Amino acid sequence: RAHRYRHNGERPETLEAKCLFDADKLDVLGAVGAARTIAYAVLAGQPVLSEPSQQFLETGKNEPGEPHSSYHEYLFKLRKVKDKLFTKTGKTIAADRDAFLSEFYERLLAEYLGER
């Protein structure tokens, strides 16, 4: 249970629990994380990308009728993952994967908006 993302979950205490926590979180970052997030959005009937409302940007809550795209998931959850890790190795790997994910979604949004 200590490896769950939830804010009120148990915090990992042992080295093994911290390693498991970090490994679980690293799976949602980088190229694999982008692919998983997009696949999940599509399987859930949500768009790959839609611009988030101002309300979502400020509160993390969608406006009525606003889809929860993979970009929403990135903004709400994935970009914060690297700050929750415990091990030095996990943080090092996360920094690289987070940078890729950030670049990927910036590029995806720019192409979606016709800016690139």
Language-model features: where?
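His-Asp-centered metal-binding catalytic motifs of divalent-metal-dependent phosphohydrolases/nucleases
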Residues: R1-Y5
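Divalent metal-dependent phosphate-bond-processing catalytic cores, especially two-metal-ion Mg2+/Mn2+ enzymes
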Residues: G9-R116
